[in-house]
Each structure stands twice: as C-alpha cells, then as structure tokens.
Amino acid sequence: APLTKVAGESRALDVTLHFDPDFQRLEGRIGDQLVTDLRFNQSQMTHGLVSFDRSVSVPEVGELLVAGYLPTTDLDLWNPVVALFSGASESKATVWQPVFDLQFDYLNLATFKLENIAAQIRLAEQATNIAFTSDLADGKLVLPIGSSLVPGLHLTRLALPSTLLEEKIGQKGMDPRTFIAADFSVEQLSVGDKEWGALAFELRPEVSGATFNNIVGDFFGLRPGLFTKEPDTEFFWRYDGESYSSRLIGPVGVDNIGDLFTGLNIPRVADSQSGKMLFD
C-alpha cells in the first residue's frame, strides 16, 4: 500500500462522530500517523482531510485534501488511490474535489533520481494536473484523460549537474522509438554552472525513431522558432536497432553567435548582433 501498511498488519483505530444535532464531523486515527477529519452538511461530505505524517489544516469547503509524507514510494501503488478519488469526484452528488499534497525525500523516475520532492495533484475532467518542485526541476505535468491527447511537461526550472548529463548521454541502448509523445517546455535550463536558456518542442515517437517538432527557444543565442512565417524548426533522431542518425532542418535565428562558443567552452572567435541559419 502507498502509506506503508501491508496486508494483514493490525493498527489501532479510533473514530469520533460529532452531531449538532445532525451529523457534522468524523474524526479518525489509524496508528500513529494516519489522521482523517471529514466535515458534513445534511449528511453529505463537504470537505475534509486525510493526512499521513503531515501537520496540515482542514481545507476550505469543496476540497478533500489528501496530504502525506514518505521517504519514497512506488508511483504505481498510487494508481488505485487516484482512481478511487477520481471516481468519487465525478459522482453527481459530490460537492468536493480531491487534492493530493505529497512530499518525498526522493523518487526514482525512469533513469533519474529526484530529491526533496513536493507535489500537488488535482483531478480535473480532462486531465490530471501535477504541480511539483524538486532538487532538479520545478514545473507542471499535465496528464490527459483521453488517449487522443498527449501529456505536457512544462518546467520553470531544470538544473542538471554536468556529471549527470555526461552520464546520461554516454548511456548505451537509448531507443528513441520507445519515447512517449509529449509537449515539453523549460523556461530556465542550466547544466552545471552554465545557463543554457529556454526551449520548447513537441516530441513524437515514430517507427524509425523520434521527431522533435515545432522547436522554439533561446539556446546559447540560437533562436529556433523566431521566424513565425517560415517553416517550423524540427529535429529528427533515427535508430534502426544498431546505429543512430540525426538531422536538424528549418530556420534558426541568431543573436550573438559568440554566446554559442562560450556555452560550448569553445574560444570565442566571432560575435554577431543578429542573423539567421537555415538547416536542410
């Protein structure tokens, strides 16, 4: 279970019901860490709190807050919990919406380890919205309900240690054909102590690899997507199971080309104020 209770384990249960004169409130405690405080009006729950190892206040009317702290967790364990509250929130008789406010010391996501994570999850009709902060990144993840839409990852900050980037680039076996379709953006990207800039693109996997469509940004003085009346800037990454190939096409605006040299630790042999490069 996500809250560290295993099947067959016994824990003390205390429940208090409040009437004034109608049923107004349910207080409960399971063990030392799990606390519930649910409020009612005319026998219908209006708002409340479910808290695990967190000191938080009961939210306003219309919200059920599920707050918890864990050192780490397996995210798959939370799928039934989210589905349970999602189904309840869609009931025509429900007047509250669930909000998950979770904190973790670390999480292993794909090949990355994130630390000091705080996430707030809100369930909407069309998507699950996750706002989060961590040691490496802050931002918002939008997971659409329908399969026809793609997830969106929008970061205000992405700070990668240079050693981590070198490690990931050097990994073998990365297959772009298995990438998940997503719309991605980052407002402030840094690697080590260097600011790289901002970048946004639409990632779409293909049979032969992956495409990065509609690239827009300001990256070391390079500005793909600057010329809105011209074709989009796109990057193609191919993989046939043995070898890789790549291709960048489209126009890229240039501010100061010297910033590119500096960012790549190359001697600054040229400067510019504006310009344009066309990749084909």
Where do the protein language model's features map onto the residues?
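Membrane-proximal interfacial segments on either side of biological membranes
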Residues: 1-280
